[in-house]
Amino acid sequence: MGCAASSQQTTATGGQPAAGEKANPAPANNNPNAANKAETTGAAEELTKESEPFVEPDPNYPDLSKHNNYLAESLTPSIYNKICNLRTLSGYSVDGCMQTGVDNPGHPFIKTVGLVAGDEECYDLFADLFDPTIDKRHNGYPRNAKHTTDLNPDHLKGGDDFDPKYVLSCRVRTGRCIRGYGLPPHCTRAERRDVEKVCKDALATLDGPLKGTYYPLTGMTEEMQDKLIADHFLFDKPVSPLLMSARMARDWPDGRGIWHNADKNFLVWINEEDHTRVISMETSGNMKNVFKRFCNGLNKVENALKAKGYEFSWNEHLGYVLTCPSNLGTGVRAGVHIKIPLFSKHAGFESILKHYRLQKRGTGGVDTASTDGTFDISNLDRLGTSEVQQVQSVVDGVKKLIELEKALEKGSDISGQIPRDPAIVRAEQVKEGYPDLSKHNNHLAHCLTYDIWKSLKDKKTPSGFTLDGCIQTGVMNPGHPHIMTVGMVAGDEESYDVFADIFDPVIDARHGGYPKDAVHVTNINHADLKGGDNLDPKYVLSCRVRTGRSIIGYSLPPHCTVEERAAVETITIGALDKFDGDLQGKYYPLEGMSDETQTQLIDDHFLFDKPVSPLLTAARMHRDWPQGRGIWHNENKNFLVWVNEEDHIRVISMEKDGNMRAVFKRFCEGLQKFEQMIKKDGKEFMWNKHLGYVLTCPSNLGTGLRAGVHVKLPLLSKYPRFDQILRALRLQKRGTGGVDTASTDGTFDISNLDRLGSSEVQQVQFVVDGVELLVQMEKKLEKGEDIFDILPQQCRPKPPIKPFSYDYPDFSLHNNWMSKCMTEEIYNKLCNLKTKGGVTLNDCIQTGIDNPGHPYIMTVGLVAGDEECYEVFAPLFDPVISARHGGYALDAKHPTNLNAAELKGGDDLDPEFVLSCRVRTGRCIRGLALPPCCTRAERAEVEKITTEALSTLSGPLKGKYYPLTGMTDEEQEKLIEDHFLFDKPVSPLLLCANMARDWPQGRGIWHNDEKNFLVWVNEEDHTRVISMEKSGNMKRVFERFCDGLKKVEDSIKSKGYQFMWNEHLGYVLTCPSNLGTGLRAGVHVKVPLLSQQKIFDSILDHMRLQKRGTGGVDTASTDGTFDISNSDRIGFSEVHLVQQLVDGVKLLVNLEKALMKGEDINSLLPEKLREDSS
């Protein structure tokens, strides 16, 4: 799955830069020898892996330097660069997957995953990131591993005999998701409602003890809610930052609900973290009964779904596919509440848990501690073992815990029953010689156990080769985190038998599953190959087939003696000397080679060098160099034999054209002739029916064949699913420079992926057929055509199901301007539109959906993701703006006036009453998305543009920028003391608008030396500009405000940027409430007497002013001191609004003074209000 893409994706996400992104041209390949370097590198691919080279990170690459999660451990610039522009068929990106891990750095002692899937396809399309994350999270799970599923409760042994004195309850839960629907981080409302309906209908088919009732969270009565809380069945709206950042709380409680049977021991949560969470439980010690109910219920639900054409997301590698990688596999958590007050204090408690693969927590849930010796004990594993195996580990472990608790109650010594400390055991094993492979990443490290090592360490093959000889290269070379090497070699043919206990599992792992009883197929009859003589030479530059052969009776290169090596050389030369016709050639020994011959072989790219790779030198393949080594080639230079390199011989057939058939024919005929010649001398190749041709490295067993073509695929190689296409065709790619090189111009060396289990003809056929298809795809892409229909069938993901439910939000309980103005007609008209930057209507309205509002506080419920939103979604934004701003007409023009000289007064506000003055506004930079939808790169660009502009300020405005990232404690304390620091958003309004993403990246605070001119960068808007001082001089504050703003704007204009502004909306900002001027001019004013008058609010309304407490938004005054500011933003100029404030505050102060003197204030009131005061 995961190869297909829609026609839109072919052009929009096929490796091309998205709108607004700059493509970095790839450097040209100027190496004339690159095409032939592949084979002259010497050793097989598995033995020459090198470290990943430095890669320049994409501008959107996140800063994870302070993070402690598996995402941070797994993500590299090269991985991110490769997948950051890809989209699944439902439109999900890798940034969506990893946002929760970026936003939540984690705890030093608690490692989270940091990654979620938005749909099933994520695990395939973004496998370069998910695979290493899954491997780390599940303690080693390679990408070719197969998961085991077993939901047959009869396979569980015991579990019905827990002592109820100790086991208080048993519970088994898992998750299931329905294929074709988005997962909770990404699903639409319609998809969520579909899932609810599909699951509800399936659950309705259950009968007998499983028959139950569904309780939707939407519209749930208080009585029902209380009942479910009392039963501990109700799940709450997510508040965890991990879930919030993954966007799992959207549209709450729409589409969520709880189902349980009449006996209340089988429960299903719908649309919580996964589509369903299935739970079987009871207050007893009968885990067998609980597990049986669990399996029966699950199987019946699955059958009901299948009857309606649905299925659970499952594959043989990951098992059941769920939202969080931590739950892949079974998704099972089998837990018991167990009382072990004595043993839980024993030093051996943790050892028992580790031994049985168990984990503990308190009975209060995740991350709680036990307070009375009662624990929730559950299985540690999810992936790689079956449901039965995981529940069995709990059953066996809990039995042991009870046994030990009882022993302690009797005062018995239990020290002999406690597994020894693994670290001590490990140290003792290392002293014995057992290698420490705990930091290694190779197949040897994953397969070798102490028991295997101990059983083999003293064995030798008849020629004297030991286990240490086999594994030394893997011990000395830990490997690379993202490149899995084998870590083993054979010293002779018998190595594979004598040391089969380690070779067999390594071979199985390396070759993607190859059991001990498998039989390998050999076929080197070139006539059986179909086609291959017509690969288009415009695309296919060269063809090559190579293999290795070893001669029975002689040790392999890691172990052979000088005499054996010389004998191999003699046998080989003797056979090759008998070649005639087109195969006739000459042998060039490396020992004593003349400079002239060496130069010629270098020019022909035939010469192989002395091994320098630590993988080869640790395997002792460089010994006695260059004795016994040499190169033979025919006169046409298209058939080549290396002698005593990594294997006894390496045979290569090649030519510069697209005729793979001719290359393979020559390969087969040459090999067969060579074998005939040595057989006449009584020699044979190493071969057996299980392993095929026996060679030094287990990676080359079977055929040992690598059939490769150099093919030009500049367009297809940029296609989002190129790697998945290759995997489906059983092919692999590398650059034309050899192992671990990358293509720089779209030319690749494409070869067969398999070696063992299929024949030579089959493997070359894969290459021929696959390359033909790749070239066909390249040609279609050149014509601008879609390639979906010719993709390999097995790699086409199932397209998303088209929901039957309606996507329109439920606004029945909402009180915000968006919900008041939205209609189904407007929604249907706009819901499928996008701005050029990709912002959707749902991006804009999500905060209003998720925050219904307060009966007495009307919020907007709408944000813009970029400037274009106000045009594309105008049918919604226009009525919201009109309603929010008291009837702002569609054809209205907003006046702008930042000439402070036009302000009358303001420098004479009485400081006895006016404590401070402040003017703030926001500004956003055209061409860059607004905070709800900006990328990390855009946020960084805003920061750069703004700070560079601010650095040009001089005189009283000169200041310094303090980025939140990397801020010192000293700076932080100082900014808190000055009340300048802004915090990470915690308001649900901002969180649901996606404004806290990537915190604190790109955010910062700038202020001048006098600390009266302040700029916040990338808070709610690109910039928030503030002028302030502790006095009653609003005129001076406003002059500084206008002066600073103008100078910053002039500076950014000089760099080719400008603020978002138009004549209708004025300055364009994120929230419609701030459109126009974005200005809030406020004073802290003491009016304790006036504020107690009934007419106080009427005066403010009349003067177009508003009040709040001095603690900020939605705070109340406690001592008669208020923060008074202008009510309006749009339709009036900056000067007009500040003038309103100045005039209004003067009136308030005069009224307060009159009241202090005991005077009647009616005559001082505005005329319209005077009658009301009587």
UniProtKB/Swiss-Prot annotation:
CDD domains: creatine_kinase_like (cd00716). Its EC number is 2.7.3.2. ATP binds at residues 169-173, 232, 277, 333-337, 542-546, 605, 706, 734-739, 749. Residues 1-14 have a biased composition (Polar residues). The keyword Lipoprotein does not apply. PANTHER family: ARGININE OR CREATINE KINASE, CREATINE KINASE B-TYPE. The keyword Repeat applies. This is Creatine kinase, flagellar. Residues 18-39 have a biased composition (Low complexity). Belongs to the ATP:guanido phosphotransferase family. Residues 166-408, 539-781, 913-1155 form the Phosphagen kinase C-terminal domain. InterPro entries: ATP-guanido_PTrfase, ATP-guanido_PTrfase_AS, ATP-guanido_PTrfase_cat, ATP-guanido_PTrfase_N, ATP-guanido_PTrfase_N_sf, Gln_synth/guanido_kin_cat_dom. Residues 1-62 are annotated as: Disordered. One of its GO terms (molecular function) is creatine kinase activity. This axonemal protein participates in an energy shuttle that utilizes phosphocreatine to transfer the energy from ATP generated by the mitochondrion in the sperm head to dynein in the distal portions of the flagellum. GO terms for biological process: cell projection organization; phosphocreatine biosynthetic process. Keywords: ATP-binding, Cell projection, Cilium, Cilium biogenesis/degradation, Cytoplasm, Cytoskeleton, Flagellum, Kinase, Nucleotide-binding, Repeat, Transferase. One of its GO terms (cellular component) is cytoplasm.
